[in-house]
Structure formats: structure tokens, C-alpha cells
Regions:
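N-acyltransferase acceptor-side catalytic subdomain
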Residues: 1-195
């Protein structure tokens, strides 16, 4: 079995980490270095942990933290990020989360995995984390059934949503079906919104 390496970073830009996030299904912009840079301008600090195998990132997370009165709060939004081809990594990441919380003297830590993070939630509970219904900084994930014709899709939306779509089209917004080749552009757009 190959040895894993843990790398700690605090820099506000990390193109290697951002590239890793682009390559995995659950990579989210809230974990990208651009998001950390935007939050650092608002007084947050960042600690990024990357787990490497053969000099290649296979998982990690980014903790943002700051002082709030007498305590230090931290959060991991839409993380940890894990390469699906790396089973067993979750246990290592949770240990690193606890270590980083202690190292950075974080009193209260919110870990908010991705929507597909059911195994992460279970592993966190097994390791002493308590469930809480706190919301992340951005709660804007939407799942939309796009099966059927465009008319079918629109008919499943509320009247007000359909009205806003028509207004947007009148203002020049173009709607088209995306392709796999558009994903990198979409991810870049999400990163640019963090700047």
C-alpha cells in the first residue's frame, strides 16, 4: 500500500487543489481557494489540508475560522472533498479535521458535507460530532427534474418562476442545454463569483 502524505496550506490561491475539486463529482466551489480568498477579505482565516498519494491529491478539506467574541468558530462548507476511488480515506480526513480544529484552537466547528455526503454524516457522528440544523453560508442547491419537453419542465415550476424566466428571456438571457464540455466553464464561473 502506498504511503499517504498530509500537506497543510494557508495560501489564498491553490491551483492544484482547485483542479482536484474540478475532477471529482462532489467538488464544490465553497471548498475552492477562491472562496477562501473571498472569505479572508471578510476577516476569516483558512487552513487547507490535502491528502496526497504519489504526489497526487486524493482528498482534503478547507476550514475557515475566525474569532467571535471569546470563542473561535470554524466551518467546513461542502467538504471534506474525497476522490471516490480512495476508500478508507474518510477516517483519515476526520482525524485531520479534529487535529486542525485543535491546532487552530477552534471552539465550535460546523462541518457541512455535500448533499451526497451520507457516509460522511454517519462517520462524523461515529467520531463524536453532533448533528445540528445550521445552514451554510450559501443554501442555493436546487435539484430540478429536467425530463420531458421544455413545456413539461416549465409546467412543473411555480407561476412566479415561469414569469421570471419569461422576463429574463425578454432581457436577452439565452437558455440552452449544457454538455459535459461546459462543466469546466461552469465551475470557473462559480469560482469567479467568489472573487
Amino acid at each position: 500500500m502506498e504511503k499517504l502524505t498530509v500537506r497543510t496550506g494557508t495560501q489564498d490561491t491553490d491551483s492544484e487543489w482547485d483542479h482536484f475539486l474540478e475532477q471529482i463529482p462532489d467538488g464544490r466551489f465553497e471548498q475552492c481557494s477562491g472562496w477562501a480568498a473571498a472569505k479572508m477579505e471578510q476577516g476569516w482565516r483558512c487552513s487547507r489540508i490535502e491528502i496526497l498519494r504519489s504526489s497526487r491529491i486524493i482528498g482534503g478539506f478547507q476550514i475557515l475560522f475566525r474569532n467571535k467574541g471569546p470563542i473561535r468558530i470554524g466551518y467546513i462548507s461542502k467538504g471534506p472533498a474525497i476522490d471516490a476511488k480512495s476508500p478508507g480515506l474518510l477516517r483519515i480526513l476526520i482525524k485531520q479535521i479534529k487535529d486542525q480544529a485543535a491546532t487552530n484552537r477552534i471552539t465550535a466547528l460546523l462541518v457541512h458535507p455535500t448533499e451526497n455526503g451520507h457516509s460522511v454524516y454517519a462517520a462524523l457522528r461515529e467520531n463524536g460530532f453532533l448533528p445540528n440544523k445550521l445552514y451554510s453560508v450559501i443554501e442555493a442547491t436546487l435539484f430540478l427534474d429536467t425530463s420531458g419537453s421544455q413545456t413539461d419542465v416549465l409546467n412543473r415550476m411555480s407561476r412566479k418562476t415561469r414569469q421570471k424566466i419569461r422576463q429574463s428571456i425578454k432581457r436577452g438571457v439565452k437558455i440552452r442545454e449544457g454538455r459535459d464540455s461546459d462543466l469546466s466553464t461552469f465551475f470557473q464561473l462559480m469560482q469567479d463569483t467568489c472573487k
